[in-house]
Amino acid sequence: MQNIDLISEQEAKKLLKELADKIAMYNHAYYIEDNPLVSDSEYDQLFNINLKLENTFPHLVLSNSPSKKVGANITNKFAKVIHQAPMLSLSNAFDEDDLRDFLERIKNFLRINEFTPIFCEPKIDGVSFSAIYKNGLFITGATRGDGYVGEDITMNIKTIKNFPHKIDNAPEFLEVRGEIYIEKQDFLNLNKEQEAQNRGKFANPRNAAAGSIRQLDVAITAQRPLKYFIYSGGVTEQNLASTQEQLLTKLKALSFSVNEISKLASSEEEIFAFYEYLKTNRHNLPYEIDGVVYKLNNFAMQNRMGFIARSPRFAIAHKFPAIIGQTKLLSITVQVGRTGMLTPVAELDPIEIGGVVVSRATLHNFQDIARKDVRIKDYVFLQRAGDVIPQITGVDISKRSNDTVKFDTPVFCPSCNSKLRYVSEDIIIRCDNGLNCPAQNYERICHFVSKNAMDIEGLGRKQVAFLIDKRLISNPLDIFFLKEKNETNLIRLENMDGWGKKSVANLFKNIEKSQKISLQRFIYALGIRHIGEQNAKLLAREFGSYNNFIAQMELLSKNDSDIYQKLNDLEGIGDKILVDIVDFFYVKENTQLIKRLGSVLNIEDYQETREQNILTGKIVVFTGSLSTISRVEAKEIAEKLGAKVTASVSLNTDLVIAGVNGGSKLKKAKELNIKIIDEVEWLAFIKNA
């Protein structure tokens, strides 16, 4: 990137637009998909370039500038929760000079000469959340979202061990804010479980926590080892205490978990000493921290300082430097995932970083390799900040030799040699060859047999690779004819290396056992991109039986608009997922395989767990403002009674509940002659349901 100190106004205008688009994409990947595309340090670098350009050319600041936004726009998978006060992020200090500037700004703003006490806390590398209590009862939990509107994760938070559902001696209204995280050892154990179940491993504890708390299926969240710390009282904190130190004491007395590792610093020297102490000892903590948060201790002074667009003036995060190492890049391998996405991985001369021997590192994406000019046989800099595999941050050009080799971004799939499809400016590259691609086929079979899919015990990744190599299976269907094929083979499976009579007998028994399966698990086992367990359940619930499901999907592949609209109305099935479903069933091989699987499996119809009642299976839409209960509560009640609540009115809608100012949804319902009731009728309706 060119020297931004010498950049022209025209160049700055263009670069600000590029930065806004790129940072928005990175925010979406990090906050919404829990799948970061770049390292924290690279993100911070881009963000700081954006800030510097905006300071130099303030008249060029865009309306969608990342400096004005927190997090990312939320999805439609969860109900929305409007925060009582914005949940902003913190500005960053990367060195002592940045921190001294922060302390000087406090003095200048408050017009004081003396040092005012600063409260110092570890910066937990987790997921921010808010929790609301009324009369001591926990009623609403939400993610940060975009800072102003979060996602409703109330039921998910309730699964966290030791999180209080009821508080004694609490004020009438209470908000607390904190961080949800997973401890290091729990994270390692979780990834072992993921691997054993043929499921993807999480990149780091933060990603695992984010992916766990944002599950549509609360039962999955309940299985995850989530913990939390509370660090703020939100809009109510100044009713509880007059300082941050007093607040944490009060929150602890109310039975919340607070971080005991904190310090009230009375001088600049004490701040730096606390930072050095945590930086040195962070590896001994059971959880990941990535810096220290400093806040003015006095709430009255915090009020005087106020906020800027996306962060408070009275607080700052002092980031730790990542653990750095240097080693030789031996090669770059390209992995092809189950859905065809290609990922570059650096193969390294083994090196110890932070007590862990590292032989592989992530290169994030192919654009990243070109931007950093990473070449095979280069000496590369690594950083490790809690990731399972570290990140390559740059190249030691001074050690570059003449025999280094530039990496060519693949044009053809390394597994099947088919032409690749480039998505998002080379950041994402896909192979669209599906089952005909050996790598995708292998990953898809591994997913098919995994615990939450067909659940065939004794058939893990190693065994699948062996059976494919010996040409005993080539697709999921072959698994169910393996016993028959084995009986006619010259060399039987039980006589091959790594197998025995008992293990083979158990495998065949487990294969037979797996042939009776619920519709939702069967749909999940198919491995459709973005169709996880919850979305598989939504589809199973919508179509009811295997025969109806496959018939409707065949119509969808032929561009049937009614089926398309029906899927589009399902809460949780957005445009992106709908495109993935259409793409999957457009491939004839996929449909043929599913039909053949249907002939050998006993796929059970979807069974609703709740009792049947008047609302079961009905599609309901809420519009306008309700006065007696919130929209979120109304939605939960409707779903508990078996209804499907959707966001838009269509021909498939059975009932519209209209509050005050119903708007366009109410108008459309009248045009389509859909039954409409008001709030009073709705309350009477659910009472008798």
Curated annotation (Swiss-Prot):
It is an enzyme of class 6 (ligase). The keyword Cytoplasm does not apply. It catalyses: NAD(+) + (deoxyribonucleotide)n-3'-hydroxyl + 5'-phospho-(deoxyribonucleotide)m = (deoxyribonucleotide)n+m + AMP + beta-nicotinamide D-nucleotide. The gene is ligA. Zn(2+) binds at residues 413, 416, 431, 437. This is DNA ligase. DNA ligase that catalyzes the formation of phosphodiester linkages between 5'-phosphoryl and 3'-hydroxyl groups in double-stranded DNA using NAD as a coenzyme and as the energy source for the reaction. It is essential for DNA replication and repair of damaged DNA. It comes from Rickettsia prowazekii (strain Madrid E). One of its GO terms (biological process) is DNA replication. PANTHER family: CHROMOSOME TRANSMISSION FIDELITY FACTOR 18, DNA LIGASE.
